[in-house]
Curated annotation (Swiss-Prot):
Disulfide bonds: none
InterPro entries in the record: RNase_P/MRP_Rpp29_sf (IPR036980), RNP1 (IPR023538), Rof/RNase_P-like (IPR023534), Rpp29/RNP1 (IPR002730)
Enzyme class, broadest EC rank: hydrolase
Gene: rnp1
Pfam families membership: RNase_P-MRP_p29
Signal as UniProt keyword: no
Protein's recorded name: Ribonuclease P protein component 1
Length: 94
């Protein structure tokens, strides 16, 4: 399935480029790289030339670059959960 802005919340995030735009932890703002792993509450971002960074989803706003080149901002609170569980969840966007 092609990743689009409409289905990003229901899709696997591993392999996408992401940057932390806003965070409750100021030291995490600006972390950019590929998403290497995803757990229920965290994502692991591989920083080029640096260590892997584990980030709590609920505490950040991410700028995610889609394979077609589009970039979108995603509140990490909507990403909390495993990808297979996010498929079942209904998201009300007002």
């Amino acid at each position: 399935m092609k990743i689009t802005p409409k289905n990003i919340l229901r899709h696997e995030l591993i392999g996408l480029e992401a940057c932390v735009v806003k965070s409750k932890n100021p030291s995490q703002v600006g972390i950019c790289g590929l998403i290497l792993d995803e757990t229920y509450k965290t994502i692991v971002i591989g920083v080029p030339g640096g260590p892997k960074k584990r980030i709590f989803k609920a505490q950040v706003v991410l700028r995610i670059k889609l394979p077609d080149g589009k970039e979108l901002l995603v509140d990490g609170a909507f990403l909390v959960g495993r990808p297979e569980e996010r498929l079942k969840r209904r998201v009300m966007l007002w």
